[in-house]
Swiss-Prot record:
Disulfide bonds join 6-52, 20-41, 28-83, 42-99, 54-115. One of its GO terms (cellular component) is extracellular region. This is Alpha-amylase inhibitor 0.19. It is found in: Secreted. The keyword Secreted applies. It comes from Triticum aestivum. Endosperm. One of its GO terms (molecular function) is IgE binding. Homodimer. Belongs to the protease inhibitor I6 (cereal trypsin/alpha-amylase inhibitor) family. The disulfide bonds are essential for the inhibitor activity. InterPro entries: Allergen/soft/tryp_amyl_inhib, Allergen/tryp_amyl_inhib_CS, Bifun_inhib/LTP/seed_sf, Bifunc_inhib/LTP/seed_store. PROSITE patterns: CEREAL_TRYP_AMYL_INH. Pfam families: Tryp_alpha_amyl.
Length: 124
């Protein structure tokens, strides 16, 4: 297994991580996240291979923006009312850390907790 196995629809369902969407919407503007919301999101993420968790989070963020009419390179704020875009990206990138789920950041197998590619999402 490796990052090349992380195809959307195979490594994770599409749309990705539906249980993590409410978590992201709440967390990005500093709202309290109910325990059940956190648990559901972390459970969903835990079912995805550690190679593919960042890809799934990236796919989730991407689809949340695109559903609200954002094109590549221009962010729609409709997906995340009252949230700054850079906060949205960092919040999404940190969901693995919030859930304490390791990720594989590169082929050397180094484990980490924050998805750098998600934090660098190009729409913002």
């Amino acid at each position: 297994s490796g990052p090349w196995m992380c195809y959307p629809g195979q490594a994770f369902q599409v749309p990705a991580l539906p249980a993590c969407r409410p978590l992201l919407r709440l967390q990005c503007n500093g709202s309290q996240v109910p325990e059940a919301v956190l648990r559901d999101c972390c459970q969903q993420l835990a079912h995805i291979s550690e190679w593919c968790r960042c890809g799934a989070l990236y796919s989730m963020l991407d689809s949340m923006y695109k559903e609200h009419g954002a094109q590549e390179g221009q962010a729609g704020t409709g997906a995340f009312p009252r949230c700054r875009r850079e906060v949205v990206k960092l919040t999404a990138a940190s969901i693995t850390a919030v859930c304490r789920l390791p990720i594989v950041v590169d082929a050397s197998g180094d484990g980490a907790y924050v998805c750098k590619d998600v934090a660098a999402y190009p729409d913002a």
